[in-house]
């Protein structure tokens, strides 16, 4: 979708922009593919906060997305491109030849009226899903499985894509959008093309209220808290951290501290790590 810039009539709208929704062809979702979505405000079943800065937000319904694409050799026609409030990517409504309907992530270039298919013998074209072993080297892919039959887990957000770099017996090499090169089982499936809505990264909220609509509450800096609330708190005026390294609210090292386990089983499948910023090297 394109980006629409608003006139600066108020301070909140001065730099604000939003989607123009030019690609959206249907505004009401398919009722049979909806599920209730309860907001928990970051609390668990005991009512205790497990994730900070969450709460409120607009009510929304979950769109049931087909990440598995296991309906093989049955062609489906793209009936509509819809907005999904639960993710950054748009979704496409498919109507299969046998009468069933489903939602998929809308790849870039997918239009209403186009036909998509899944299965080992599907053509190499945008929107088709195949096992990785059947996809040519160099192809751009998205919605990649990590376990056969589990459904796509990688490369699902707006504008992202991965590339198939090579094949080895049971595994294939895939370069993810982070720059990481990873070995994935060749029996896992992926969808051809890159995710659409690639201008999402240019979105400017412009005011705090748009974060509140999304269920995001204010993120208060530790340096403006009291010493009993945060390790960075206290002091006269704008005091520095006063510690060898920044700490989390619970006293753990943060900013550049690696949190991934050195014993993780999946470490052996990472051929090359992701690109890192200067503060994490």
UniProtKB/Swiss-Prot annotation:
Residues 208-281 are annotated as: Disordered. Gene3D superfamilies: 2.30.30.30, Nucleic acid-binding proteins, Ribosomal protein L2, domain 3. InterPro entries: NA-bd_OB-fold (IPR012340), Rib_uL2_dom2 (IPR014722), Ribosomal_uL2 (IPR002171), Ribosomal_uL2_bac/org-type (IPR005880), Ribosomal_uL2_C (IPR022669), Ribosomal_uL2_CS (IPR022671), Ribosomal_uL2_dom3 (IPR014726), Ribosomal_uL2_RNA-bd_dom (IPR022666). PROSITE patterns: RIBOSOMAL_L2. Keywords: Ribonucleoprotein, Ribosomal protein, RNA-binding, rRNA-binding. One of its GO terms (molecular function) is transferase activity. Transmembrane segments: none annotated. One of its GO terms (cellular component) is large ribosomal subunit. Residues 254-281 have a biased composition (Basic residues). Pfam families: Ribosomal_L2 (PF00181), Ribosomal_L2_C (PF03947). GO terms for biological process: cytoplasmic translation. Part of the 50S ribosomal subunit. Forms a bridge to the 30S subunit in the 70S ribosome. HAMAP family: Ribosomal_uL2_B. One of the primary rRNA binding proteins. Required for association of the 30S and 50S subunits to form the 70S ribosome, for tRNA binding and peptide bond formation. It has been suggested to have peptidyltransferase activity; this is somewhat controversial. Makes several contacts with the 16S rRNA in the 70S ribosome. Belongs to the universal ribosomal protein uL2 family. This is Large ribosomal subunit protein uL2. The lineage of its organism: Bacteria, Bacillati, Bacillota, Bacilli, Lactobacillales.
């Amino acid at each position: 979708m394109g980006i629409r810039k608003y006139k600066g009539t108020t301070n909140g709208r001065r730099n604000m922009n939003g989607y123009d929704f030019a690609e959206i062809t249907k505004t009401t979702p398919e009722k049979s593919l909806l599920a209730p979505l309860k907001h928990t405000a970051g609390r668990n079943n005991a009512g205790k906060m497990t994730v900070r800065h969450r709460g409120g937000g607009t009510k929304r319904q979950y769109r049931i997305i087909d990440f598995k694409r296991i309906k093989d050799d049955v062609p489906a026609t793209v009936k509509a491109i819809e907005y999904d409030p639960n993710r950054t990517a748009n979704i496409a409504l498919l109507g299969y030849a046998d009468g069933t309907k489903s939602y998929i992530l809308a790849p870039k270039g997918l239009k209403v009226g186009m036909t998509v298919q899944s299965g080992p013998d599907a053509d190499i074209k945008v929107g088709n899903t195949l096992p990785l072993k059947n996809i040519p080297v160099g192809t751009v892919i998205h919605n990649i499985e990590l376990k056969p039959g589990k459904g796509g887990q990688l490369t699902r957000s707006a504008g992202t894509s991965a590339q198939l770099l090579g094949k080895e017996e049971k595994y294939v090499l895939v370069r993810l959008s982070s720059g990481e090169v990873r070995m994935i089982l060749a029996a896992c499936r992926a969808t051809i093309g890159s995710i659409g809505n690639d201008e999402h990264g240019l979105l400017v909220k412009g005011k705090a209220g748009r974060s509140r609509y999304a269920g995001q509450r204010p993120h208060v800096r530790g340096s403006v808290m009291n010493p009993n609330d945060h390790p960075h708190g206290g002091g006269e005026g704008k005091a520095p951290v006063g510690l060898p390294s920044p700490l989390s609210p619970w006293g753990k090292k943060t900013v550049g501290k690696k949190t991934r386990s050195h014993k993780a089983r999946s470490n052996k499948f990472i051929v090359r790590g992701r690109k890192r910023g200067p503060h994490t090297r």
